[in-house]
Amino acid sequence: MKLKEILTSIQPVKITGNQDIEITGVDIDSRQVESGHLFMAMHGTQTDGHAYIPAAVEKGATAILCEELPAELAEGVTYIQVADSEDAVGKAATTFYGNPSSKLELVGVTGTNGKTTIATLLYNTFRYFGYKVGLISTVCNYIDDEAIPTEHTTPDPITLNRLLGRMADEGCKYVFMEVSSHSIAQKRISGLRFAGGIFTNLTRDHLDYHKTVENYLKAKKKFFDDMPKNSFSLTNLDDKNGLVMTQNTKSKVYTYSLRSLSDFKGRVLESHFEGMLLDFNNHELAVQFIGKFNASNLLAVFGAAVLLGKKEEDVLVALSTLHPVAGRFDAIRSPQGYTAIVDYAHTPDALVNVLNAIHGVLEGKGKVITVVGAGGNRDKGKRPIMAKEAARASDRVIITSDNPRFEEPQDIINDMLAGLDTEDKKKTLSIADRKEAIRTACMLAEKGDVILVAGKGHENYQDIKGVKHHFDDKEVLKEIFSLTV
């Protein structure tokens, strides 16, 4: 593709050099540059891509996109100066890969909790209907049934457009995608065309990055502000920010709720450990999910599928066949008669939702033992809140290590313990070794009890000092239960 074709989608401040050159690849990582590539320098959170411009030129880059031009311009290289490289990178990548999102029905899911579940269940629902479908999520990316490992909730713009391009080329009609607040703020989705967007909820998370809840809200809201006119926005009325999210959107707004009058109205009729009986828009259905938060997630899936043209009755049949997503309220029964639940809950609100769901099913007939930690080098303010919520809704709590990253596990545990009063501390243990913490919970559990192992869910590693060590909560539980993994 000619450089001048790529530049039609962005507004350069200044161009130095030949725009008629052939571009054979686009990169934001100088290590991946090859001869004939366009290297795009971004101000990253860890490193500044501008520092790698000489390395990119040395490796054969024939064009450089940047915010600040180097002091010395290499001969035979075209330099494109832009005001905002984050925005330009997304648009350039979209153009280079043939604007793949315009060939797909792309639906984005954003919010603090529920993104993975809703995106994955939509993917499974439309596969049930017989379509080729793509999924971009925290757990794994999929092109129909081909799994593609994932590093981030939302990939960088180049990886994202390359992936969407493959999905379009391989015949996918629908793609369901988690859209993180980081990706919106960093404009990773710049240039993409969405057919629809779903808002789940907004609670405290990622304040290490966004600094304030207001900034976090603005990042989420921008996704809906940028929605095109002929798309839909489906928002959760049960969240106080539901209508705030869509107040400036050009898209058609629809609502879903378990509490209020809405376009898609749901109720929980019955709840058991095996699942729930629900009412969606005056239709009853039985599902293999537990908890009001999952009823809300399923209602969002129902609404989105209907907005994408499916009949309500057909969607209800599809929903009744679905299974819970890996690491989301993932229950296994022990030979001793207690139940262990592995869940990704890593925010105070998500933890409350899971514990409430457990109590809703238990009805006071067994103890709840919660194993929980908090991630290192992340929002420290939520640590004492997590511990307090765990203690409030559990009979025993074991505070342990999660992904300590570059912090000391005991320091994180101490931050969590600071949220507990004297009564809370009487029922709380702190065990830094996560495996030992889970083992202790199993030793304390009796028939009819429930152990919640919270925070990591689907993850199969522990991030310690920059190294990912294999660790899987479900594997550990099965090992303790003496079950075959």
Curated annotation (Swiss-Prot):
Transmembrane recorded as keyword: no
Record keywords: ATP-binding, Cell cycle, Cell division, Cell shape, Cell wall biogenesis/degradation, Cytoplasm, Ligase, Magnesium, Nucleotide-binding, Peptidoglycan synthesis
Pathway where it operates: Cell wall biogenesis; peptidoglycan biosynthesis
Binding-site residues for ATP, renumbered to this chain: 111-117
Single GO cellular component term: cytoplasm
EC number of the protein: 6.3.2.13
GO molecular function, one term: UDP-N-acetylmuramoylalanyl-D-glutamate-2,6-diaminopimelate ligase activity
Keyword Nucleotide-binding recorded: yes
Cell compartment(s), UniProt: Cytoplasm
Motif (Meso-diaminopimelate recognition motif): 402-405
PTM annotation, UniProt: Carboxylation is probably crucial for Mg(2+) binding and, consequently, for the gamma-phosphate positioning of ATP.
Required cofactor names: Mg(2+)
Physiological role: Catalyzes the addition of meso-diaminopimelic acid to the nucleotide precursor UDP-N-acetylmuramoyl-L-alanyl-D-glutamate (UMAG) in the biosynthesis of bacterial cell-wall peptidoglycan.
Family: Belongs to the MurCDEF family. MurE subfamily.
Protein name as it appears in the record: UDP-N-acetylmuramoyl-L-alanyl-D-glutamate--2,6-diaminopimelate ligase
Organism whose genome encodes this protein: Bacteroides fragilis (strain ATCC 25285 / DSM 2151 / CCUG 4856 / JCM 11019 / LMG 10263 / NCTC 9343 / Onslow / VPI 2553 / EN-2)
